[in-house]
Amino acid sequence: MDPNTVSSFQVDCFLWHVRKQVADQELGDAPFLDRLRRDQKSLRRRGSTLGLNIETATRVGKQIVERILKEESDEALKMTMASAPASRYLTDMTIEEMSRDWFMLMPKQKVAGPLCIRMDQAIMDKNIILKANFSVIFDRLETLILLRAFTEEGAIVGEISPLPSLPGHTNEDVKNAIGVLIGGLEWNDNTVRVSKTLQRFAWRSSNENGRPPLTPKQKRKMARTIRSKVRRNKMAD
């Protein structure tokens, strides 16, 4: 096993422990608490995959961090903080909307790069909006925390989430995953639009309805549908 993989996990465990102490003292805001819950699940999966005990890893991670802080000068810390670009955390969803469990009558799941796409194929003829919580840097989506598809009644019918086993994704990864989710939902005659926040930062080529432009495949499908309807109308006449 790569020693850097182990040490990274150990440090992540200790830093999560520190953040948990902050949350326990009620010093964390909603995005902070949201990331804390999601990172806990991710650490459990990583620990299981690596075969490492989280409690032991946390103690070793503490030793690594303490050694680094002991060697780090205040001036170097100031320079590091000053040179790091600041990211913003944007929220379309409340904590309740993000943490709510949901169920699918006809589940479909697809992995697109480092992202997992899930949708309920039983949903038909609904107006659906995509909402997401994510961070932005340099006016571009940096990290997707979670994206969910909601009906007008508030039911969750789809989701895009990062795969813990494949950390890191690009703005293009997110755009492609959104296209897959929209295509899957529209297959059952649902009308899908995205939130204004997503429309602004996830892609720049959406139309005024919050819809991404049709892909060539979607255009061909629409053309076939129109031709089929025209033929049926002629036969009826």
UniProtKB/Swiss-Prot annotation:
Motif Nuclear export signal location, chain numbering: 137-146
One Gene Ontology molecular-function label: protein serine/threonine kinase inhibitor activity
Region (Disordered): 205-237
Keywords: Eukaryotic host gene expression shutoff by virus, Host cytoplasm, Host gene expression shutoff by virus, Host mRNA suppression by virus, Host nucleus, Host-virus interaction, Inhibition of host innate immune response by virus, Inhibition of host interferon signaling pathway by virus, Inhibition of host PKR by virus, Inhibition of host pre-mRNA processing by virus, Inhibition of host RIG-I by virus, Inhibition of host RLR pathway by virus, Interferon antiviral system evasion, RNA-binding, Ubl conjugation, Viral immunoevasion
Region spans: RNA-binding and homodimerization: 1-73
Localization per record: Host nucleus; Host cytoplasm
Region (CPSF4-binding): 180-215
Organism domain of life: Viruses
Annotated segments matching region PABPN1-binding: 223-230
GO terms under cellular component: host cell cytoplasm; host cell nucleus
BP GO terms, sorted: symbiont-mediated suppression of host cytoplasmic pattern recognition receptor signaling pathway via inhibition of RIG-I activity; symbiont-mediated suppression of host gene expression; symbiont-mediated suppression of host mRNA processing; symbiont-mediated suppression of host PKR/eIFalpha signaling; symbiont-mediated suppression of host type I interferon-mediated signaling pathway
Main location: host cell
Gene3D superfamilies the record matches: Influenza virus non-structural protein, effector domain (3.30.420.330), S15/NS1, RNA-binding (1.10.287.10)
InterPro entries per the UniProt record, alphabetical: NS1, NS1A, NS1A_effect_dom-like_sf, uS15_NS1_RNA-bd_sf
Pfam family, one: Flu_NS1
Post-translational modification: Upon interferon induction, ISGylated via host HERC5; this results in the impairment of NS1 interaction with RNA targets due to its inability to form homodimers and to interact with host EIF2AK2/PKR.
Renumbered ranges of motif Nuclear localization signal: 34-38
HAMAP family registered for this protein in UniProt: INFV_NS1
Family (UniProt): Belongs to the influenza A viruses NS1 family.
Subunit structure, as described in the record: Homodimer. Interacts with host TRIM25 (via coiled coil); this interaction specifically inhibits TRIM25 multimerization and TRIM25-mediated RIGI CARD ubiquitination. Interacts with human EIF2AK2/PKR, CPSF4, IVNS1ABP and PABPN1.
Comment on protein domains: The dsRNA-binding region is required for suppression of RNA silencing.
Name of the protein: Non-structural protein 1
